[in-house]
Structures are given as structure tokens and as C-alpha cells.
Amino acid sequence: MPTSSTAADAPIAPAVPPGRTGRVARPLGVVRRWFDTGATVAETVDGDRIDWLRAVPFVAMHLACLAVLWVGVSPAALVVAAVLYAVRMFALTAFYHRYFSHRTFRTSRAVQFFFALVGASCVQRGPLWWAAHHRNHHRHTDTPLDPQSPAVHGFLWSHVGWFLTPRGFRTHWERIPDLAKYPELRWLDRFDLVVPVALAAALFGLGALLERVAPQLGTSAGQMLVWGFFISTTVLFHATVTIN
């Protein structure tokens, strides 16, 4: 894997979004911490421990896949799951990775935002967080400063552990000055669960509609939610972190 990067060679330090202070926020409730990543933006104490409160949505997404035992499967649900996997994998590969992280091509601001939205539905945080950490990964590949290195930290930590910590949760704004100037991207980064929740709700609604108007498809609201969102997203996550 190449170790060059377009990011500035500045040391990683606690950073805050443009226009915000570095004051440590008081606890604001678990729900706000899930939906507003800026609620404790300057958290630094014990930065390498797993924050289990913030990890709840990630764990719940995996457990929700077990609901397939109750909702069953249908060709319609499988098609939706496969299509959403492919479309979102493209958004991650072409835009989160090649465009936002490495800036390998140019596009319009509208296209940039559209694929940032699609990428945000993958439940892999916002495009700014993703790009900042990926740039840091390339800058410090296989060194103690690279939490994604299985050679240094072990497979399990590099696969699912590092981003569940306070240190991994922060967006390192000093790595992405070229992206942080866009307020719409900063909003997506701060409220990174809004798009996934909207997609899950839309899939539930689609399943309910199909169950009513096209019962011959054999699908339902719960089935479309489980296959189209939970299973598709979980498989997408593990495919992504296996590569990146």
C-alpha cells in the first residue's frame, strides 16, 4: 500500500470544526452523542479505550441482522440488498476513497454532495471523518500512529476497534482543510446518523407499500428493513474495512 498522501504533514492533535471552540462539552445525553458528533468534540481522556455508549448503534446494527430469522427472505428483498450494496460500495470506493481522501479527480459541488449523501448512508461516518482518518492512515502506514495497521495493533483492533474509541471518533480537521470549507459536508460529518436513519425508514416504508400493493412479491416492511439496510450495510462495512 503506498504511503504518500495529499494531506499536510502536520502532527495529529485534537482539532475542532471551523467556527467552533475547543471547549470540552459536558455530558449531553447518550442520544445526542449518537446523533451529534460535535457534542463532545474535544474529548481526549483515555482516548484509546472503547466508548461503549457510542458503540451501541454499531453493535445494534449487527444484532439486527439476526431478525432475518423472523422476517424471512424474498427475491425482492435480495435484489434491494444487492443494489444498495453495489451503489453504496461505488460511493465509498469512488468518492469517499478516491475523491475525498486522495483527490484523484475533480467534479462539481452538486455531484460531490450527492455522493457524500450516498456514502453517508453506509454508516461509516461522514466524508470528512473518513477522509481525515484515511489520509492519516497513509501518512503513518504500519507505524504506532496508524491505528488501522494489523501489523502494529492486531487484526481485531484494526478491523473494528480503533474507530470505537474517543481518539478514533474525532475528525482531524487539520488533515482536510480542502474539504472543511464546505458547510454541507461539515453538516453531514456532524450529524452522520441522519442519512442512515432516513434510508432505514424509507426501506421500511417501501416494504410496507409493496406488501400492500404487490403481495405476490412476498416481502414486508420488516424484511425490506433487515435485508435492504441491516444486512446490506453490515456486509458493506466488513468488505470496506477488510480492504481499507
Language-model region placement:
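Non-catalytic, topology-defining segments of multipass membrane proteins
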Residues: 1-244
